[in-house]
A protein has these predicted regions:
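Acidic, Mg2+-coordinating phosphoryl-transfer loop and its flanking beta/alpha structural elements
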Residues: 112-159
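Short, acidic loop-to-helix structural element flanking the phosphoryl-transfer center
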Residues: 28-55, 86-91, 260-265, 269
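Substrate-recognition element of Asp-dependent hydrolases with the DxDx(T/V) motif
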Residues: 10, 40-69, 77-83, 122
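Basic, low-complexity terminal or inter-domain segments flanking catalytic cores
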Residues: 379-422
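Substrate-recognition "cap/lid" segment bordering the active-site pocket of phosphatases
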Residues: 62-110, 116, 120, 315-317
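Active-site neighborhood of HAD-like aspartate-dependent phosphohydrolases
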Residues: 1-49
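PRPP/pyrophosphate-binding module of the type I phosphoribosyltransferase fold
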Residues: 124-130, 135, 306-381
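Active-site-facing substrate-recognition patch
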Residues: 175-262, 302-330
Length: 422
């Protein structure tokens, strides 16, 4: 496997602004002053022993990057890559015939890095990405997203790693280490999730977790927007629903392994009576296998009008849910802990409103689990007819992808050009 490794913040603990003059090539770096993350050299050596080819992929100046790559790690490097622009990386791939040949199968490649830029360039190359979390940022960098939590997560890395051992585990068995629902569609069982949010309330907490990515635009092949849209397909199969439920069950088995947290109820966000197909979430929920006590806690008002999907922003979505979706009365929730399952996490309006309703009922701990979460869009191809950016769309009926130059009829400003993706 070709393993592209970010340098600063991934192999070297040099994300701090003190290192900027060296990374920019203004000052010469003394290698004695380059702090390596514990185990970095051994990690690179282990990759090579196992037959992998590590290559440093860095935005920093070649004078800085090459010195570290050659004298500390003894591996090749690409510098001044201009992440997330993939052009220079593609030029490197295409200029090396053996690497170019491997690139025909994107499973031969992976990118490891600590910022959303590493994730985005990986998505543009359609290869898997590992977002590392090896240090706590001392300041926020707007461009790299260093010190921010939400943007790297919303960019949609394939994997997350807190140590080099985590990265090695991913490289050794990449399909097994996918998110729970992404893994199930590769015939693997995984209990992995995205830790999207955690809020502490004086010893009580609310946590949001997501089990698969809903891609928008370029991405690695393991993100499953096609499967999300399949939920709404009236012709969806029982096998498909069973796989979704199994992915949820696999994650809940992980939750059950923490006896310090006692969960009283497992519930779900029910569907409106007008939803098609009807009771889609209940059908999934009924197939989820867990030891938690299942219960229905939410229902929509009979007079609900409109659709949450058509609301333009977080505020409008939150107001819609607060008006029409209610926690059922008559069930004592005071001091209880509740797990809630929903199909999608986008703006977080549903998760936040439901969490607030449960807290108003006295609920102690809340675990909100979304089957899919919508990641940030990436557009990288221009329309051959009008030059505007093409969007990758998915046919809800069969899950096939296609490029679309969205016309005004569908909320865009393009010419309507369509191109199938093989």
């Amino acid at each position: 496997m070709i393993v592209f490794l970010d340098l600063d913040g991934t192999l070297t603990n040099t994300a701090h602004e003190w290192f900027k003059p060296f990374k920019d090539g203004i000052q010469e770096i003394d290698l004695n002053n380059v702090p390596l993350f514990n185990g970095a050299k051994q990690f690179v050596e282990d990759l090579q022993k196992e037959g992998h080819r590590p290559i440093i992929l860095s935005d920093s100046h070649p004078k800085y990057v090459n010195k570290i790559a050659q004298q500390i790690f003894q591996i090749p490097a690409i510098s001044l890559t201009d992440k997330p622009n993939a052009e220079k990386t593609l030029n490197y791939i295409n200029s090396n015939p053996d690497i170019q040949q491997l690139f025909s199968d994107k499973d031969n490649f992976i990118i490891v890095g600590d910022s959303w830029l590493d994730v985005e360039i990986g998505r543009r190359l359609n290869i898997r990405t590992v977002l590392t979390q090896f240090y706590k940022a001392s300041s926020i960098e707007e461009r790299d997203g260093i010190g921010q939590d939400w943007k790297p997560i919303k960019m949609g890395a394939t994997y997350y790693a807190k140590s080099f051992d985590d990265v090695k585990k991913i490289i050794q068995n990449p399909n097994k280490e996918l998110l729970a629902i992404e893994a199930i569609f590769q015939n693997e069982n995984s209990d992995n999730m995205v830790r999207f949010l955690y809020r502490n309330y004086n010893g009580e907490f609310t946590a949001f977790r997501c089990l698969a990515r809903q891609d928008d635009g370029e991405c690695d092949k393991f993100a499953r927007a096609d499967k999300y849209y399949q939920i709404d397909n009236p012709e969806r199969s029982h096998d498909f629903i069973s796989k979704l439920a199994q992915g949820v069950s696999n994650y809940l088995s992980r939750v059950e392994k923490f006896p310090q947290y006692q969960w009283d109820y497992l519930t779900y966000v029910s569907d409106k009576k007008t939803t098609s197909p009807p009771n889609k979430m209940k059908e999934i929920f009924d197939l989820v296998n867990s030891n938690f006590n299942k219960i229905k806690l939410f229902e929509w008002s009979e007079d609900v009008e409109g659709s949450l999907r058509n609301k333009p922003n977080y505020k409008a979505r939150r107001e819609f849910i607060a008006k029409y979706l209610k926690t059922i009365d008559g069930i004592d929730l005071n001091g209880k802990s509740v797990i809630v399952i929903d199909d999608q996490f986008t703006s977080s309006a549903t998760a936040n409103e439901i969490s607030q309703q449960l807290r108003n009922k006295g609920v102690k701990n809340i675990l909100f689990v979304a089957l899919f979460y919508l990641i940030l869009p990436i557009e990288s191809k221009a329309c051959p007819q009008c030059g505007k950016s093409l969007k990758i769309k998915i046919k809800r009926k069969d899950g096939n992808r296609f490029y679309s130059c969205l016309s005004p009829q569908f909320g865009g400003q393009g010419c309507g050009y369509i191109e199938n993706i093989n």
